[in-house]
Amino acid sequence: YRRQRQMCIRDSLCRPQPGYETCRYVFFPGCQAGAIAPDVVTEAYEDLCRRTEGGVALMLGCCGAISEWAGRYEMTEKVNEQLKQELAKLGDPMIIAGCPSCMKQLKESLGAKVTGIWEILKEIGLPGQAKGLEIPVAIHDACGARGDTQTQDTIRELLADMGCTVVNTEYSRDLSPCCGYGGLTAYANKEMADKMTEKCLERSDSPYITYCMACRDRFVREGRESRHILELLYGINAANMPDISEKRYNRLELKEKLLKNIWNEELMMEKKDYTVAYTEDAISMMDERMILKSDVERVLSDYRENQEAIFDEETKELVTRSRLGNVTFWVRFVETEEGYLVRRAYSHRMNIMKRVGQ
């Protein structure tokens, strides 16, 4: 949870629409949308700015659900206070949420005025590029929408307006099962989360349409064609399943592009004079163990300064480590002409003590 929260903080952004100091609305797409389908976030925000009156601000970041699920209620309070301050600067606008869990969290934690982007699009009309799939689809209702009949109905109306044929499944609406992401199940018990995802997919062989980006990501990883409704509404098929590092990169790149293209602000990204490459095994291992490329690159940066590493005679690899926060990260790599090739990475909650003078 802590890693997720830290990434969301670093990738956060809050700006009023150009030409406004305060706004009638603020678009809050949710952290998973920016990580998985950043182009959808951009298209949706620009569309809202064009077709609504009174100004639409943009807020990228965490709604507080992650810390709430982790039982870190003191952190949730900090998130709430930060959100309240940012909203006050914008004139306490109505929040347009792109995620039902965000919508639920923001309503309950802040007592804020919140609506779903699906409600706004129902009111102002479909975007010009909206297009449904030509084959029957199944709807997966998000956990955050349980008890929210209005949201459930609106999603179905929008799909019908796009010409989608919806297949009824045995369990839907309030009985729709969790995809395995809710409550951070995928981080606490991966095997259980995988079983939950498989159970969801047993209901139909059709492509799944969701309105929660985390659900869409879980289903795609299991090999099922799945789209977030905003992908259909804005004619974008992200068609990917980014690993943990790619999700972080997508959020950072989204922030950088939006600042540059909409607010004419340059975000200075750190550049290195060497390259870090990864084997496919290393990438798979890092995603499984939730190790970011930025973690590995910080370890290698420390190695460049201290030149501390163990040489493995058998594999001809160098092994180095650094403690980041409360975790020690280990990297096995070889040096190349351009920089480094990472072959393995792992981590432990441990501290390596050095004896002075040895």
Predicted regions and their residues:
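Single conserved hydrophobic/aromatic residue that forms the stacking wall/gate
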Residues: 1-9
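Conserved beta-strand segments that form the floor/walls of ligand-binding pockets within enzyme
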Residues: 8, 26, 138, 341
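Active-site and ligand/interface coordination hotspots across diverse enzymes
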Residues: 11-20
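A short, charged/proline- and glycine-enriched loop
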Residues: 20-28, 131-137
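Cofactor-cradling patches in redox/metallo enzymes
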Residues: 32-118, 144-159, 163-258
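A conserved helix-loop-strand patch within extracytoplasmic ligand-binding domains
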Residues: 114-138
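Short, flexible active-site loops
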Residues: 133-144, 182, 279-282
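Ribonuclease/tRNase effector modules and their secretory precursors
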Residues: 243, 247-358
